[in-house]
Amino acid sequence: MTDKEKRLERQSRIRNFSIIAHIDHGKSTLADRILEKTSAITQREMKEQLLDSMDLERERGITIKLNSVQLKYKAKDGEEYIFHLIDTPGHVDFTYEVSRSLAACEGAILVVDAAQGIEAQTLANVYLALDNDLEILPVINKIDLPSAEPERVRQEVEDVIGLDASEAVLASAKAGIGIEEILEQIVEKVPAPTGDPEAPLKALIFDSLYDAYRGVVAYIRVVEGTVKPGQKIKMMATGKEFEVTEVGVFTPKATPTNELTVGDVGFLTASIKNVGDTRVGDTITSAANPAEEALPGYRKLNPMVYCGLYPIDTAKYNDLREALEKLELNDSSLQYEAETSQALGFGFRCGFLGMLHMEIIQERIEREFNIDLITTAPSVIYDVYMTDGEKVVVDNPSNMPDPQKIERVEEPYVKATMMVPNDYVGAVMELCQGKRGNFIDMQYLDANRVSIIYDMPLAEIVYEFFDQLKSSTKGYASFDYELIGYKPSKLVKMDIMLNGEKIDALSFIVHRDYAYERGKVIVEKLKELIPRQQFEVPVQAAIGQKIVARSTIKAMRKNVLAKCYGGDISRKRKLLEKQKEGKRRMKQVGSVEVPQEAFMAVLKMDDSPKKQ
């Protein structure tokens, strides 16, 4: 057999697939079982959620980063097949990670919980898989639960998604039931990769990470051609050229191989020192015989939420920059730029896909890079149209132009889809109305599950909406949102003043109808959180020049009369006058320290008034 025939024969036995599911429907457990079944790992190495390598992932029990692993499986037809399993996250903020994983596959296993049925996220991920023309294999998981209703869920998959579920495997990843059927279905139904191993090299970078010894490690899926160590490669987006030092696959440990050819999913190192040279979604081709055109990469993701990150110790500003550079390498949806604040010093304005993404990045910086952070209130991007016809894009409330010059302000709206049990429909609708939502549609999926659709301002969803939705439905609701565009709203910027000075990091943008109540709540909260000073401190909320709410932090009092026993009233009065004068002078020059809790208070408006 020639090299080419060998490669083509091997190619016909490759199956690339990923597992998609809503959070907690069991995809990491299923991945564990598949690894055991194909004996990719010994019992000794087995631990729960094997592919979730980040500590954070294991603690929270969620998958954040995608991971890939190569498995060998001896099927019933006697052939040995090569599987590439690419693990994907299930949370709404990480949809991008999912779309990257799916671009590297030909098939997807759709895991649906036999007790809970289809959730909002399941749908979102299925549509992504259909966009990528993948073969979808439905699997109904957790059939060993007492509350499992596999037949109802099978019907739901057919009705809601429109997939043929007659051959859906009934499985329990935990108990190891049905795993073999799943593997056999992968062999039969998932198509082998197409592509010519002799053609010019084309490989898609779907992830990358930085290794202190080897430089950048790129995770690639070879679409056409072959790549070997010693070969010169070129990045199509940047035009940079490198020499490959090592290629290999994950079994789950990184294992070097002689070459990667069509359909292989593995890694490549080429002494790439600069983090920016390997963009995720870029195409690698050979320098000597480059491909004509790049693979369709990923769409560049735009952040939805911005917030300021500042190191508590200002000397760590450069460490924070390095941390962000390294995180940006394998999380291309993170964006950041330097900014300064009078209250907090030097820091960065960072863009995230959503609140969970923001929390995860914050935690990763604090853990992996050991930098303590202060974060400012998250805000979305507003389009501000000026009276002179100019349009200004505002992602930081303190950059809001002067209200006199503003003609209108537009804010991003999202279409929010919530799947809720029947009993909680009223509570959810009330919550959405309170968040300035517009009711669009409501459908009954079956006797006790309802899908509710609202158009809502992204700014209202950004903070705590998900938590409030969960608590108003006892944790049963699931939620997914997509951006639909910008709409004009009556928005104003609210400044918080301490002792007559504006604190730039506490400013936020609010709807005019809610401004008074929001101002009142914040002023009261700050009054509790800011420590008392030697002098009286007024806390005010202002819109432009107009003060809408005020409260006063009382001064601490020293008893200056303690040393006067009895004595003349004029003597006492003199001491009190002197104290009063001292306090007045102090008030003119005194500055007030704002604790971190005060910044968080502006965000946590959970007791903000509901608009009737």
From Swiss-Prot:
Domain tr-type G: 12-194
One cellular-component annotation, GO: plasma membrane
Membrane topology field: Peripheral membrane protein
Keywords: Cell membrane, GTP-binding, Hydrolase, Membrane, Nucleotide-binding, Protein biosynthesis
Cysteines paired by S-S bonds: none
Cellular location(s): Cell membrane
UniProt cross-references to PANTHER family, sorted A to Z: TRANSLATION FACTOR GUF1 HOMOLOG, CHLOROPLASTIC, TRANSLATION FACTOR GUF1-RELATED
Name of protein: Elongation factor 4
Organism: Bacillus subtilis (strain 168)
Taxonomy of the source species: Bacteria, Bacillati, Bacillota, Bacilli, Bacillales
Gene designation per UniProt: lepA
